[in-house]
Amino acid sequence: MEVNDNLPFMDGDAAYPESMADHVLEGADWPLFAPPREPVSPTDHAIGLQIARLIPDGGTLQIGIGSIGDAVAAGLILRHQRPGDFHDAVMALEQNRPTGTSHLSAFREGLFGASEMFVPAFLDLMEAGVLSREVDGACLQAGFFLGPTDFYQRLRDMPDQERARIAMRPVSYVNELYGPEDEKRRARVNARFVNSGMMATLMGAVVSDGLEDGRVVSGVGGQYNFVAQAFALEGARSIIAIRATREGPKGTESNIRWGYGHTTIPRHLRDIVVTEYG
């Protein structure tokens, strides 16, 4: 086990005593890996607004790292703090004909977070009063945290009372429903599991981690686990965010395909796919 004083200590069931380690390395306080936050494009913001209206008050939220997760958080904060502006933005995107269920009002109960990765967007939501529904004293359960340097500093500066509202859990606890299932079902009410993909097919499959020529773009991470959870939890939904187009060698290409030679999420687990157009 390596001890690094630069790493903010976040408590929870994931903590374990020093006696469990065969060896403890101290004094090597290396700079932390601190990936910068990606710029949030207008396309990302449009997707974030579309998703923010799908999140019910009193529900549960999972998001991952990246600009779309930040855009979803920005949309939720706008909805909570300036619901009139949020309503107008959604109506403009939907040309005053919103499809599906829309949750447009500010949060009264607030949201509970359950996510493999604790990203800066969750801290933004906590500070804005959106992430406020507590279960056993915590408003967020997460497996690990990652972010830029200022994110780590915000965690270090956090008052103990606020830090106690973040419960670090084993990844296996957050990503799966089995184990203390009744406990998890009680916490993960009306869950919305939000993940990003590169492409989706008209049959419902999602491509997130690789290309059909075998090239690996990313790991699957917990995406499959959370999509599967959405089908196992009452009232839960899986939401896949995909930019409608990309720039290819021959110009603009659609990310909504009839079929594709690689699949991350199979078509039988299809649910909600959101682009900047709806």
Locations of the language-model features?
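Conserved alpha/beta enzyme-core scaffold
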Residues: 1-277
